[in-house]
Amino acid sequence: MRSRLLKILICLIMIISYIPITAISVESGESVVDGSTAGAPIAVPEEGLAISGGTLYGIDKTWFANVNPDKGKVYLAISIPSGVTEINNDGLKDSYTSDKKLHNAVTYMDGLGSFSVAALSFDDATGLETIGEQALQGNSQLTGILDLSATNVSVIKKSAFSGCSNLTGVVLPKTLKELGSRSSSAGSVFNGCEGLRYIRVAGSSNQNAVFELP
């Protein structure tokens, strides 16, 4: 009898050892962060960002290849570091630019898969001064409030956040001087952001304002 129980116990141990860790996590109620959904994006460390001379060009190819071996689509969570002074044109997308190629940043043409930013924080971006053209254009995964109040942004170039249809609010920094690359393109910055309920300047005396300039 003891011999039989011992055999059963050994079999159970062997079976458990082959259960994937992810399956155990799901059964125990823990969330699995694998980047496969917008609700569970992979947090990008600073070394996962392609940064040169204070300019953020995109996501570093080497880091991306390591976290996306299946070369599918992944969702990312990005916190802009304090040392970044500029987000380059298309800097938060996987679209192709010659600057990205030059600075080892991922594009959809690299055969490494694709990505979309599902969470974006500017809380630590105290050195940020410029957000380039089409930086996050067409992103529908980003939700909630785009809060730039901790930054020193003075320029947001044309179409930077156009088509971010699920943003509900924007808080602009007091340092902002230029919205759009020129006066005729100012409206393009948040064009197509259909979910927006308000745009405010940080420190506004009227927190119920739909749009207020300093």
Predicted features along the sequence, with ranges:
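A short glycine-rich, aromatic-capped structural motif
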Residues: 60, 65-69, 79, 88-89
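Bacterial N-terminal signal peptides that target proteins for export
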Residues: 1-9
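Short beta-strand/loop segment at the start of cytosolic alpha/beta domains
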Residues: 33-66
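Extracellular, surface-exposed repeat architectures
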Residues: 57-63, 160, 200, 207
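Structural signature of tandem-repeat unit edges
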Residues: 40, 44-52, 70-86, 97-130, ...
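Bacterial N-terminal signal peptides
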Residues: 9-19
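Sec-dependent signal peptide cleavage junction
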Residues: 18-40
